[in-house]
Swiss-Prot record:
GO biological process, one term: protein quality control for misfolded or incompletely synthesized proteins
Gene Ontology terms, MF aspect: misfolded protein binding
Repeat region (TPR), residues: 84-118, 128-161, 358-389, 409-442
The protein, known as: Protein MRG3-like
Lineage of the organism: Eukaryota, Fungi, Dikarya, Ascomycota, Saccharomycotina
Top-level taxon of origin: Eukaryota
Membrane topology of the entry: Single-pass membrane protein
Cellular component per GO, a single term: mitochondrion
Annotated signal peptide: none
CDD domains referenced in this protein's UniProt entry, alphabetically: Mgr3-like (cd24145)
Transmembrane portions of the chain: 54-74
């Protein structure tokens, strides 16, 4: 939408049009392949008739005029008065001598008022797009209270509309959900009130998930196995580690490798139900982070497991899946520490529960061991994938490869910490050094510091 407001050449569109032109030209030469048709094109220009000259000249001029119109004229659905104001705002935002965000903000606010005067739909792409631009200017000017208020009003507007029982087309409903989740993420990132964030996050996330699942039967099967936002204790006896994705370990490794080896191809248009999948997964990650901040480790674990299942079903990019799995391994490890803390409390403090102490202790020990094993499984699966695909040796400078290396460094670090926890000092040192070496390749400085801190613990302990 916004790209058409610039009066400058659009590289992407130009490339596409040139590609189409080449295709047209190729077909044209094929079409004129007969001797009769070729004779026309082979006539020297000076020998052509006036009519031929006129036809060729007119065609060339028309072609140039069309391309100038297509490239430079703004193709958007804003009313003309609104578009005129928006151009001024964009110019102030990107001019070479320095962006004037305050001036841009004034223009965008003026454009919003003009939209109201033109009776533009308050939930349309155009109207909400201007509101988002206003929010961006507020953030760039460090006017976070104003940005928070704006996003909060937008969330209320979208929630009220999406909660209505009136019939809407699936396409429009999914557009509203996509926009709603985009604003929800922005609101959560700048608002300091964690309780408000949590309330709105759960409200909007549940609404989006309900609508999504109604149109995605394959995801309902996953839902039947684990709740969307379930804070209850997992049933550890029925929990099988890596097969939470619905596959055995070998099948999962095959799935990862097939994703890596698949050839690059033109992306097919998104199906309707996947239009807002990226925003939905981002919102779920926000909920996981909220659970971690509240020390609700069971809630965080359940949330992350379900999110990873959804990522696999939605065929998310490989690097996203591996990073999500590394995070899941960390959450499993945190849960193991929680159970270990409970065991320590039983052994060192009076316990007042009526249930036999040994039975409680046995259950906690089982849970602690299970979490530690599942954590190691997550990390080892990433390392196994990397070894089979010769990482980090084959890694390029691409963003995907850099993110895969990040997941790999986290996996080696995680295994190193687990080995240290179990007293396997030599193995721990080896894994931590690998984590540091890979982190240095991608300048993952935070992990380098953490791994070096763990190495000091290893070096300070007699082997």
């Amino acid at each position: 939408m916004w790209k058409y407001l610039h009066r400058s050449v659009k590289n992407e569109g130009t490339v596409e049009r040139l590609t189409n032109l080449n295709l047209f030209t190729n077909h044209r030469f094929k079409f004129y392949s007969t001797l009769k048709e070729q004779s026309f094109w082979r006539i020297p220009f000076k020998r052509r008739s006036k009519l031929q000259k006129w036809v060729l000249s007119t065609g060339i001029v028309s072609f140039i005029a069309f391309n100038i119109w297509w490239v430079y004229w703004p193709h958007h659905t804003f009313p003309k008065p609104v578009a005129k104001i928006l151009r001024k705002g964009l110019h102030s935002e990107i001019k070479k001598e320095g962006a004037n965000y305050q001036k841009s903000l004034e223009y965008y606010l003026e454009a919003l008022e003009e939209c109201k005067a033109e009776n533009v739909d308050l939930l349309s792409d155009e109207y909400t797009g201007i509101e988002i631009k206003i929010g961006e200017m507020y953030e760039k000017l460090h006017m976070y209270n104003d940005a928070t208020a704006l996003y909060g009003d937008m969330l209320k507007k979208f929630y009220n509309e999406l909660s209505k029982t009136t019939d809407k087309s699936t396409k429009r409903k999914f557009f509203l959900l996509k926009r709603d989740l985009q604003i929800l993420v922005r609101f959560n990132e700048i608002n300091k009130d964690s309780e408000t964030n949590a309330t709105l996050l759960i409200m909007h996330l549940l609404l989006a998930q309900r609508e999504f699942l109604e149109n995605s039967p394959e995801f309902k099967n996953v839902l039947s196995k684990s709740e969307l936002l379930n804070n209850q204790q997992l049933d550890w006896k029925n929990f099988k580690g890596l097969p939470f994705i619905g596959k055995s370990k070998p099948d999962y490794q095959m799935h990862l490798n097939s994703k890596r080896k698949q050839e690059l191809k033109i992306k097919e248009p998104e199906s309707e139900q996947c239009v807002f999948m990226k925003e939905l997964l981002t919102a779920r990650d926000l909920y996981t982070r909220y659970c971690l901040n509240r020390s609700n480790l069971s809630g965080a674990l359940n949330s992350k497991i379900t999110t990873l299942e959804w990522m696999l079903l939605a065929d998310s990019p490989l690097d996203d899946i591996l990073l999500a799995q590394a995070e899941l391994g960390s959450i499993f490890y945190l849960n193991s520490e929680k159970f270990e803390g409970s065991l320590y409390a039983i052994d060192n403090e009076p316990y007042k529960k009526s249930e036999p102490l040994e039975l409680i202790r046995s259950r906690l020990q089982e849970n602690q061991n299970s979490c530690l094993q599942y954590s190691a499984d997550c990390y080892k699966s990433i390392i196994s994938f990397a070894n089979e695909n010769q990482y980090p040796k084959v890694a390029m400078e691409s963003e995907m490869d850099q993110r895969i290396l990040k997941a790999l460094s986290l996996a080696h670090y995680g295994i190193g910490v687990i080995n240290l926890h179990k007293g396997r000092l030599r193995a721990s040192k080896k894994e931590l050094k690998k984590a540091i070496r890979i982190s240095e390749m991608i300048r993952f400085n935070e992990l380098i510091e953490e791994a070096q801190r763990e190495l000091k613990k290893v070096d300070g302990t007699p082997i």
